[in-house]
Amino acid sequence: MRLQVGLLRLVTMQQIESHARLTDSAFHANRDRMQQLVAELRAHRTTAREGGGAKYLQRHREQGKRPVRDRIERLLDPGAPFLELSPLAAFGLYDDEAPAGGIVTGIGRVAGREVVVVANDATVKGGTYFPITVKKHIRAQEIARQNRLPCLYLVDSGGAFLPLQ
């Protein structure tokens, strides 16, 4: 069945028939493993969202600064979604001392327009740039260029992380 609505054409597809046997032990083993992997993924994302950790977040607040995701939320239009890009950048790198690569990047809406946001997380090594940070930053800019979106930068950075330069 096809339905034309203005320029949008809706096409209904046939339902894909499942051949999974819900009583099969392999099905249960796969399901259990997938649930374990999803739980691990959620834990890694939570760790990345915590940035440099409670100690550095507290120090940041004592300096009168807002956490990176709070700054982003205040920048975006009220209720606007934020699609974070590469939240697990640097996972398993640098002894896990650069959660999310030290920056938060994503797509959100400001003044009614979609934008790419690049924001340093100063709780991660003072917002300094690791090699993966540079890659993540450049990738966000490429996405902005390809989609003709303006970039907004929330900078709170100590420059390059010198031990890795």
Task: For the regions a language model picked out, list residue spans one by one.
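Terminal-region recognition feature
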Residues: 6, 10-165
